[in-house]
Every structure is written in structure tokens, then in C-alpha cells.
Curated annotation (Swiss-Prot):
Pathway: Nitrogen metabolism; urea degradation; CO(2) and NH(3) from urea (urease route): step 1/1. It is an enzyme of class 3 (hydrolase). Signal peptide: none annotated. It holds the Pfam family Urease_beta. This is Urease subunit beta. Residues 128-138 have a biased composition (Acidic residues). SUPFAM superfamilies: Urease, beta-subunit. It is found in: Cytoplasm. The gene is ureB. GO terms for biological process: urea catabolic process.
Length: 138
């Protein structure tokens, strides 16, 4: 090319790029209870990650890994690691994945939590709230 440009060349701008500035963050400790590695991509709704991954799923509602786009974190069987999550941006909707949310990640999340528990997803979070109808209450 006569103008000095190279096809596909990336010419970075000056300065520093700050990722996810101003977004809520949290950390969760994740253990892989499965017998195979599990890899979670940068923009996957972490609440719905592989059922063999055990962590506080309610803390991960509306969150994704705080890593650069197009990258992933791999969880080996039997290993445990702490990861940083960041809130999902845009319209804050999650569709597909494991079918636990299929809509907004804001507001009432009780149905998604019930589906997660019924499907046997690993969860270290709080137990389901007591409905007050136990034998000891009677």
C-alpha cells in the first residue's frame, strides 16, 4: 500500500485503557468438584457457569469474570482459586447459557436461584430461606 498502512495492522492510541472502570466488583472462591477441567469465558454470566464449579452463586448473579474480552479462566479438577467478578454492563440481560436466568439479571432472582438449586449446581452460598413450615415450628 502506498500510504504505509499494513492490512490488519493495529496502531494503538496513546494513554492507558482502564477496563470496567466504575463497575461493581466482587471476589468468589471457586472449586472444581468435577472430574474434567472447566473453562469459563470473559463474558459468560458466572452465576450459570458449569454445575461442577462450587462457589457462592448468588454473589455471582449479574456478574462476569473481570478479565480482558476473548480470554478465559480454566478450573482444573480438585483445584480451588479465587477470581474477581465484575457486573455485566449494557442491558444487563443473560440468555441461553444454562437456562437459569433467560432475561434480566436485576430485580427478583429467586426463580433463577431455585432452578440452580433444583438442577444440582455447586453452591457455597446461603441455604434456601426457611418457609417457617418445619416440624420444630409446630
Amino acid at each position: 500500500m502506498s500510504d504505509g498502512l499494513v492490512p490488519g495492522e493495529v496502531i494503538p492510541g496513546e494513554g492507558t485503557v482502564t477496563l470496567n472502570e466504575g463497575r461493581e466488583r466482587t471476589e468468589v472462591t471457586v472449586g472444581n468438584t468435577g472430574d474434567r477441567p472447566s473453562q469459563v469465558g470473559s463474558h459468560f454470566h458466572f452465576f450459570e457457569a458449569n454445575a461442577a464449579l462450587e462457589f457462592d452463586r448468588e454473589a455471582a448473579m449479574g456478574m462476569r469474570l473481570n478479565i480482558p474480552a476473548g480470554t478465559a479462566v480454566r478450573f482444573e479438577p480438585g483445584d480451588e482459586q479465587t477470581v474477581e467478578l465484575v457486573e455485566i454492563g449494557g442491558k444487563r440481560r443473560a440468555h441461553g447459557m444454562n437456562g437459569l436466568v433467560n432475561g434480566s439479571v436485576d430485580g427478583e432472582t429467586g426463580d433463577a436461584v431455585e432452578r440452580m438449586r433444583a438442577a444440582g449446581f455447586g453452591d457455597t452460598g446461603e441455604a434456601a430461606p426457611d418457609d417457617g413450615d418445619t416440624e420444630s415450628d409446630q
